Amino acid sequence: AFCNLRRCELSCRSLGLLGKCIGEECKCVPH
């Protein structure tokens, strides 16, 4: 599956984290 950066950012933001696409994976990382 292709990582959608916008969707990744939105889902991570709700956790108070920053969304990053690593390859095809969405990773939530601290700011």
Curated annotation (Swiss-Prot):
<dbReference type="GO" id="GO:0090729">
    <property type="term" value="F:toxin activity"/>
</dbReference>
<comment type="similarity">
    <text>Belongs to the short scorpion toxin superfamily. Potassium channel inhibitor family. Alpha-KTx 05 subfamily.</text>
</comment>
<feature type="region of interest" description="[R/K]XCQ motif">
    <location>
        <begin position="6"/>
        <end position="9"/>
    </location>
</feature>
<keyword id="KW-1015">Disulfide bond</keyword>
<dbReference type="GO" id="GO:0015459">
    <property type="term" value="F:potassium channel regulator activity"/>
</dbReference>
<dbReference type="GO" id="GO:0008200">
    <property type="term" value="F:ion channel inhibitor activity"/>
</dbReference>
<dbReference type="InterPro" id="IPR001947">
    <property type="entry name" value="Scorpion_toxinS_K_inh"/>
</dbReference>
<comment type="function">
    <text>Blocks small conductance calcium-activated potassium channels.</text>
</comment>
<dbReference type="Pfam" id="PF00451">
    <property type="entry name" value="Toxin_2"/>
</dbReference>
<feature type="disulfide bond">
    <location>
        <begin position="8"/>
        <end position="26"/>
    </location>
</feature>
<dbReference type="InterPro" id="IPR036574">
    <property type="entry name" value="Scorpion_toxin-like_sf"/>
</dbReference>
<keyword id="KW-1221">Calcium-activated potassium channel impairing toxin</keyword>
<keyword id="KW-0964">Secreted</keyword>
<keyword id="KW-0632">Potassium channel impairing toxin</keyword>
<keyword id="KW-0027">Amidation</keyword>
<keyword id="KW-0528">Neurotoxin</keyword>
<keyword id="KW-0800">Toxin</keyword>
<feature type="disulfide bond">
    <location>
        <begin position="3"/>
        <end position="21"/>
    </location>
</feature>
<keyword id="KW-0872">Ion channel impairing toxin</keyword>
<feature type="disulfide bond">
    <location>
        <begin position="12"/>
        <end position="28"/>
    </location>
</feature>
<feature type="modified residue" description="Histidine amide">
    <location>
        <position position="31"/>
    </location>
</feature>
<protein>
    <recommendedName>
        <fullName>Potassium channel toxin alpha-KTx 5.5</fullName>
    </recommendedName>
</protein>
<dbReference type="GO" id="GO:0005576">
    <property type="term" value="C:extracellular region"/>
</dbReference>
